[in-house]
Amino acid sequence: MFFAVITLFPEMFDAITAYGISGRAAKRDIVQVTCINPRDFAEGNYRRVDERPFGGGPGMVMMAEPLAKAINHAKQLASRAGCVHVPVVYMSPQGKTLNEQAVQQFVDYDGLIVLCGRYEGVDERLIQHYVDQEWSIGDYVLSGGELPAMVLLDSIIRRLPNVMSDEQSAIQDSFVDGLLDCPQYTKPDQFEGLDVPEILKSGHHANIEKWRFLQRYQRTLERRPELIEQVTLTKQQKKWLSDEQG
């Protein structure tokens, strides 16, 4: 999958391309992550990419022209890589909140061009003409779009085929089917007076699967009750709940 990131700080994305699951995917050429600095497309000796906002106010606004040139360059790179469906995504606190359903849709794309804002944001005309989607990672403000972009890339990359060494791990993550994950345990059997649930050491896989589902359902009900209404249960899961509730 092809990713082009429009950013003033390309070095930050070493965290994606050099480490962990996403780093391994990059080394195996499952993903291609290219960072494009809009300063390379700016005019003048100082290569400015920001200016004061019209109408006054604090801070600076990123200029449309260098960003547009950077995006067009990214589209050319995507085309050379054989990509057809490559939307431009702007990471913005005004965007829709990223969730697992959105991530699953991104996985089906050929690639993404991700625009990282800075300062007070970007010229609205750039958004109107070049941005296909706006996404946020939560109702709070960060110094720039780089960290949200890394969250987006990491969440997509781990869902791509052949990225996870154990693909079942990705399937069982929180939110994949709408429920939170179940409690996880490893050695030792006892830690500060707390024991691993006996059922997890029983070797009875059907009972373990039932226990894990009930734990996930109860945890979601307690911590994120608004998610329960969106969950579609299997026939077996409905039976487990019915048995548990008597």
From Swiss-Prot:
Subcellular location: Cytoplasm
Record carries keyword Protein transport: no
Record Pfam families: tRNA_m1G_MT
InterPro entries in UniProt: Alpha/beta_knot_MTases (IPR029028), tRNA_m1G_MeTrfase_C_sf (IPR023148), tRNA_m1G_MeTrfase_TrmD (IPR002649), tRNA_m1G_MTases_N (IPR029026), tRNA_MeTrfase_TRMD/TRM10 (IPR016009)
Catalytic activity of the protein: guanosine(37) in tRNA + S-adenosyl-L-methionine = N(1)-methylguanosine(37) in tRNA + S-adenosyl-L-homocysteine + H(+)
Annotated TM spans: none
Principal EC category: transferase
Binding site for S-adenosyl-L-methionine: G117, I137, G138, D139, Y140, V141, L142
One of the GO biological process terms: tRNA N1-guanine methylation
Taxonomy, superkingdom: Bacteria
GO molecular function, one term: tRNA (guanine(37)-N1)-methyltransferase activity
Keywords: Cytoplasm, Methyltransferase, S-adenosyl-L-methionine, Transferase, tRNA processing
EC number(s) from the headed UniProt entry: 2.1.1.228
Subunit record text: Homodimer.
Role played: Specifically methylates guanosine-37 in various tRNAs.
Family per similarity comment: Belongs to the RNA methyltransferase TrmD family.
Protein name from the UniProt record: tRNA (guanine-N(1)-)-methyltransferase
Phylogenetic lineage: Bacteria, Pseudomonadati, Pseudomonadota, Gammaproteobacteria, Moraxellales
